Amino acid sequence: MAFSSKTDVNSSIDLSDGYDRLAQSLIDIIKEQQAKLGYRKEIVRLYYPLSSLNHFFEGHLDSTGMLDILKEASLPECITDKLGCIKATEKNDRFCIEIPPQGSEYVHENTSDDEFIKELIKLVAEHDCRPQQIIDLFKKFSDEIEIKQIDNGEFDFYVRFLNDPQDTYYYCFHDEGCHMIYHRFLPQDYSDFKF
C-alpha cells in the first residue's frame, strides 16, 4: 500500500507519527483487555473521543477529516500489518474503531505480557485492595513515580511512572468501598479533563 505521511485533509499535519501513536494505543488497550478477560481471536471495538484521536495526530480535524485519515485506503502498514484493516465509524464526535480478529491474534502472539498491568488487574480485583497496596505495586516497578490526590468526585488519586517512555499513562483510582476501580489516561487526555 502506498503511504504518504501527508494528507489532503490538512496538509500541515504529518500523520506518520500519529498512526504510530494510534497503533500503540490500540495495542496497549488490547493487551489490557486480554490481561483482564483472556485471549480470544475475535473482533475488538474500542471507543475514542475525537479529541483523543486529534492528540495522536497533533491536529484539529473535525469528524469528517478524522474519518478520512482512518479510512482503510489511508491506513499505513504500521497499522494494517499488525492489526489488520481497522474500520472506523463516528457518531457525535465519538469514534468506534473496529479491529479484526487478526489484531487480537497479533497482540497475543507478538507482544510480551505487561507484567505491571497483569499485577494491577489482579490487585484491584481483590475486595480488600487499598491505596497503599497500589502505590507499593507501582514502587515495585519503579522508584520514580508521582502520586497525587484528586478531588473531583470521579477519582480519588492518580499514580504514574515518571521514567518509563512506554508507559506514560495517568492511572486514576477510585475507592468504591467494596473494591477499587481504575482508568488510565494518556497525558494529553488527562490534561483535557482539567482534574
State the predicted function of each range.
Residues 44, 54-87:
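Charge-enriched amphipathic alpha-helical scaffolds
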Residues 130-173:
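A cross-family detector of function-defining hotspots
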